[in-house]
């Protein structure tokens, strides 16, 4: 099941504060990942276009995130649960009734209703078997002689270093 919560409509104070902390680049981190104090003198003071782009991507991502674990779960009452169960079962019944023709088909195609007569009949003449073998050999030969000639390169380089 999915979540129908939209962050654009309702924001709690805690959500706004979390977003503000995520989006506020002026608050420096307290510690580096390795536990050492960060060196602020080595950071460049001017933001580049790339950093501005990354910040805007981060802002868009943070505004579009839906925290499913923080969303209040809407519990269903017993009658709502039973109504949904009935609704789903009627939908399944409608869908399964349209697929009943698949259940009626035999697992293997039936060429005859009396296979014992086919098995007891005369075998296929040897000349017919030879003719089918020759036709299959000609078809195999024709297929094996199919060639694709390259007229131009498949991959073209665009002079990118």
Curated annotation (Swiss-Prot):
<dbReference type="GO" id="GO:0071986">
    <property type="term" value="C:Ragulator complex"/>
</dbReference>
<dbReference type="GO" id="GO:0031902">
    <property type="term" value="C:late endosome membrane"/>
</dbReference>
<keyword id="KW-0967">Endosome</keyword>
<dbReference type="GO" id="GO:0032008">
    <property type="term" value="P:positive regulation of TOR signaling"/>
</dbReference>
<dbReference type="GO" id="GO:0032418">
    <property type="term" value="P:lysosome localization"/>
</dbReference>
<dbReference type="GO" id="GO:0016197">
    <property type="term" value="P:endosomal transport"/>
</dbReference>
<dbReference type="GO" id="GO:0060620">
    <property type="term" value="P:regulation of cholesterol import"/>
</dbReference>
<feature type="cross-link" description="Glycyl lysine isopeptide (Lys-Gly) (interchain with G-Cter in ubiquitin)">
    <location>
        <position position="60"/>
    </location>
</feature>
<keyword id="KW-0449">Lipoprotein</keyword>
<feature type="cross-link" description="Glycyl lysine isopeptide (Lys-Gly) (interchain with G-Cter in ubiquitin)">
    <location>
        <position position="104"/>
    </location>
</feature>
<dbReference type="Pfam" id="PF15454">
    <property type="entry name" value="LAMTOR"/>
</dbReference>
<dbReference type="GO" id="GO:0072657">
    <property type="term" value="P:protein localization to membrane"/>
</dbReference>
<feature type="modified residue" description="Phosphoserine">
    <location>
        <position position="56"/>
    </location>
</feature>
<feature type="region of interest" description="Interaction with LAMTOR2 and LAMTOR3">
    <location>
        <begin position="121"/>
        <end position="161"/>
    </location>
</feature>
<feature type="lipid moiety-binding region" description="S-palmitoyl cysteine">
    <location>
        <position position="4"/>
    </location>
</feature>
<feature type="cross-link" description="Glycyl lysine isopeptide (Lys-Gly) (interchain with G-Cter in ubiquitin)">
    <location>
        <position position="20"/>
    </location>
</feature>
<feature type="modified residue" description="Phosphoserine">
    <location>
        <position position="42"/>
    </location>
</feature>
<dbReference type="GO" id="GO:0071230">
    <property type="term" value="P:cellular response to amino acid stimulus"/>
</dbReference>
<dbReference type="GO" id="GO:0043495">
    <property type="term" value="F:protein-membrane adaptor activity"/>
</dbReference>
<comment type="subunit">
    <text>Part of the Ragulator complex composed of LAMTOR1, LAMTOR2, LAMTOR3, LAMTOR4 and LAMTOR5. LAMTOR4 and LAMTOR5 form a heterodimer that interacts, through LAMTOR1, with a LAMTOR2, LAMTOR3 heterodimer. Interacts with LAMTOR2 and LAMTOR3; the interaction is direct. The Ragulator complex interacts with both the mTORC1 complex and heterodimers constituted of the Rag GTPases RagA/RRAGA, RagB/RRAGB, RagC/RRAGC and RagD/RRAGD; regulated by amino acid availability. The Ragulator complex interacts with SLC38A9; the probable amino acid sensor.</text>
</comment>
<dbReference type="GO" id="GO:0005765">
    <property type="term" value="C:lysosomal membrane"/>
</dbReference>
<dbReference type="GO" id="GO:0010874">
    <property type="term" value="P:regulation of cholesterol efflux"/>
</dbReference>
<dbReference type="GO" id="GO:0007032">
    <property type="term" value="P:endosome organization"/>
</dbReference>
<dbReference type="InterPro" id="IPR028209">
    <property type="entry name" value="LAMTOR1/MEH1"/>
</dbReference>
<feature type="cross-link" description="Glycyl lysine isopeptide (Lys-Gly) (interchain with G-Cter in ubiquitin)">
    <location>
        <position position="103"/>
    </location>
</feature>
<keyword id="KW-0597">Phosphoprotein</keyword>
<feature type="modified residue" description="Phosphoserine">
    <location>
        <position position="141"/>
    </location>
</feature>
<keyword id="KW-0832">Ubl conjugation</keyword>
<keyword id="KW-0458">Lysosome</keyword>
<keyword id="KW-0564">Palmitate</keyword>
<dbReference type="GO" id="GO:0001558">
    <property type="term" value="P:regulation of cell growth"/>
</dbReference>
<feature type="region of interest" description="Disordered">
    <location>
        <begin position="1"/>
        <end position="43"/>
    </location>
</feature>
<dbReference type="GO" id="GO:0005764">
    <property type="term" value="C:lysosome"/>
</dbReference>
<keyword id="KW-1017">Isopeptide bond</keyword>
<dbReference type="GO" id="GO:0045121">
    <property type="term" value="C:membrane raft"/>
</dbReference>
<comment type="function">
    <text>Key component of the Ragulator complex, a multiprotein complex involved in amino acid sensing and activation of mTORC1, a signaling complex promoting cell growth in response to growth factors, energy levels, and amino acids. Activated by amino acids through a mechanism involving the lysosomal V-ATPase, the Ragulator plays a dual role for the small GTPases Rag (RagA/RRAGA, RagB/RRAGB, RagC/RRAGC and/or RagD/RRAGD): it (1) acts as a guanine nucleotide exchange factor (GEF), activating the small GTPases Rag and (2) mediates recruitment of Rag GTPases to the lysosome membrane.</text>
</comment>
<dbReference type="GO" id="GO:0007040">
    <property type="term" value="P:lysosome organization"/>
</dbReference>
<dbReference type="GO" id="GO:1904263">
    <property type="term" value="P:positive regulation of TORC1 signaling"/>
</dbReference>
<comment type="similarity">
    <text>Belongs to the LAMTOR1 family.</text>
</comment>
<dbReference type="GO" id="GO:0008104">
    <property type="term" value="P:protein localization"/>
</dbReference>
<feature type="lipid moiety-binding region" description="S-palmitoyl cysteine">
    <location>
        <position position="3"/>
    </location>
</feature>
<feature type="cross-link" description="Glycyl lysine isopeptide (Lys-Gly) (interchain with G-Cter in ubiquitin)">
    <location>
        <position position="31"/>
    </location>
</feature>
């Amino acid at each position: 099941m999915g979540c129908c919560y939209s962050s654009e409509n309702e924001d709690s104070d805690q959500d706004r504060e979390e977003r503000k902390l995520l989006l506020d680049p002026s608050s420096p981190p307290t510690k580096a990942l390795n536990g050492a104090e960060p060196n602020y003198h080595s950071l460049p003071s001017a933001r580049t276009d790339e950093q501005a782009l990354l910040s805007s991507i981060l802002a868009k991502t943070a505004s579009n995130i839906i925290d499913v674990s923080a969303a209040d779960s809407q519990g269903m009452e017993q009658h709502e649960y039973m109504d949904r169960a009935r609704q789903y079962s009627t939908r399944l019944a409608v869908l399964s009734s349209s697929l009943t023709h698949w259940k009626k088909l035999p697992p293997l195609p039936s060429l005859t209703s009396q296979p014992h007569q086919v098995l007891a009949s005369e075998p296929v003449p040897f000349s017919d078997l030879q003719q089918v073998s020759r036709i299959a050999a000609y078809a195999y030969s024709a297929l094996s002689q199919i060639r694709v000639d390259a007229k131009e390169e498949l991959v073209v380089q665009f002079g990118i270093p």
